[in-house]
């Protein structure tokens, strides 16, 4: 905390969204818990909540009563450079938490210019999103463009991609690798099985796609991208639909088949480790079936209504399992976390998927505030491997239940796991 003033000022970008709601829910608990490591740091903090379309004051006061005296609301278009920079200066912002859709390179550049710390949950790039010639490869292009700028950020401490995935999953990978320090995995698969869905199926609305997080971002990965994985530090693509095939995942007694999708942590881990890396994801069966039924006309799905599960509006059944599977020659090790939306909502008023993201942001924020490491931009595994960050200790305060195990066999690499639909 030596580098921060006594009266800390934090700006939260994208404050009206689901990820920000989860971050604020955790901080709302932390600020009344003297045993929480962040308690002393935030008890007098000023939170500046920024969004292009801001929520009413009553929304925040009702959800986060322990913070309401410290919340200040602004409505700013982050493309308005002058207004945003003026906000950062006049508010005396020390840390920016970015869970918005604003261009990552631009926002980090401002923080670097002003010496402000930064943390986000995903990479965003407006130019890439608007370039139709990049359809199929947009996620990789966002990563590639950020990589070209990353080493320039030497006047900020920035933690990039500290949500659940990317973010917490990289911590899982590093932790699992410690168990076999003398063995090198053949592959690492980030795995997710999200069964969250409406408890009452009669509430399903026609021509509506359902997901636990931003549906448009899910569609980017699920229907506008090609299946991608990393091998020998290089991204490789299959010229086919993501939902044309799926891959076996076995975590002890749990088994499912997930689709191969591009994801930031695949690129990040595949750069830093020489092994096959992929993300295998299975969303709720309703949305899975809708996509498969429309593979010959996926563009039509963009015209459908989109609904993110909100336990405040309807009861949500199911759970979100996120973890990692390390593949060795004759065995596999795994680690995962499972959260149930109904249980999470009871305490934090958000769904399981967003709460997992919030836990990653909390861990990264604590590391920025308390851990000593040199300036620069870090992905989570770089922070863990190259600094004395206590990221895992902070994470375990709110994400407690990790399952760790071993399969005494190996299902092999991707080509061994595939089944065609």
Language-model region placement:
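Beta-loop-alpha module in the N-terminal Rossmann-like domain of NAD(P)-dependent dehydrogenases
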Residues: 82-83, 99-110
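C-terminal catalytic/substrate-binding lobe primarily of soluble NAD(P)-dependent oxidoreductases
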Residues: 2-7, 178-421
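Rossmann-fold cofactor-recognition segment
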Residues: 66-80
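Rossmann-fold NAD(P)-binding glycine/threonine-rich loop
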Residues: 122-154
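Conserved Rossmann-fold cofactor-binding substructure of NAD(P)-dependent oxidoreductases
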Residues: 78-89
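Conserved acidic E/D residue at the C-terminus of a beta-strand in Rossmann-like folds
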Residues: 47-54
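Adenosine-phosphate binding glycine-rich loop
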Residues: 142-195, 360, 365
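N-terminal Rossmann NAD(P)H-binding glycine-rich loop of SDR-like oxidoreductase domains
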Residues: 9-30
């Amino acid at each position: 905390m030596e580098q921060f003033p006594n009266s800390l000022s934090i700006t939260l970008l994208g404050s009206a969204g689901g990820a920000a709601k989860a971050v604020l829910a955790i901080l709302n608990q932390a600020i009344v818990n003297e045993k929480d490591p962040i308690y002393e740091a935030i008890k007098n903090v000023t939170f500046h909540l920024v969004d292009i379309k801001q929520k009413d004051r009553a929304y925040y006061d009702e959800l986060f009563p322990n913070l309401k005296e410290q919340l200040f609301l602004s409505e700013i278009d982050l493309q308005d450079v002058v207004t945003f920079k003026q906000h950062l200066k006049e508010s005396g912002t020390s840390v920016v938490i970015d869970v918005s859709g604003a261009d990552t390179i631009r926002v980090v550049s401002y923080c670097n210019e002003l010496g402000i710390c930064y943390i986000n949950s995903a990479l965003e790039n407006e130019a890439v999103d608007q370039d139709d010639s990049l359809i199929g490869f947009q996620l990789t292009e966002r990563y590639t463009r950020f990589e070209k700028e990353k080493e320039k950020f030497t006047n900020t401490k920035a933690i990039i991609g500290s949500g659940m995935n990317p973010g917490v999953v990289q911590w899982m990978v590093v932790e699992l690798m410690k168990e076999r320090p003398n063995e090198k995995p053949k592959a690492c698969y980030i795995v997710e099985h999200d069964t969250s869905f409406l408890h009452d199926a009669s509430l399903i609305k026609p021509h509506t796609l359902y997901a636990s997080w931003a549906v448009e971002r899910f569609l980017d990965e699920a229907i506008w991208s090609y299946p991608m994985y990393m091998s020998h530090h290089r991204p490789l693509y299959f010229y086919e639909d993501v939902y044309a095939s799926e891959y076996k995942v076995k975590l002890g007694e749990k088994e499912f088949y997930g689709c191969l999708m591009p994801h930031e942590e695949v690129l990040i881990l595949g750069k830093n480790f020489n092994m096959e890396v992929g993300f295998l994801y299975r969303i709720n069966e309703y949305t899975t079936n809708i996509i498969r039924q429309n593979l010959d006309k996926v563009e039509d799905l963009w015209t459908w209504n989109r609904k993110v599960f909100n336990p405040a509006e309807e009861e949500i059944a199911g759970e979100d399992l996120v973890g990692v599977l390390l593949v060795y020659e004759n065995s596999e090790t795994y680690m995962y976390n499972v959260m149930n939306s109904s249980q999470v909502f009871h305490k934090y008023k958000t769904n399981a998927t967003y709460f997992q993201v919030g836990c990653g942001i909390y861990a990264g924020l604590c590391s920025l505030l308390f851990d000593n490491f040199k300036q620069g931009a870090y992905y989570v595994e770089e922070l863990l491997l190259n600094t004395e960050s206590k990221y895992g200790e902070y994470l375990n305060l709110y994400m407690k239940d990790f399952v760790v195990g071993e399969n005494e066999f190996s299902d092999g690499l991707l080509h061994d796991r595939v089944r065609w639909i």
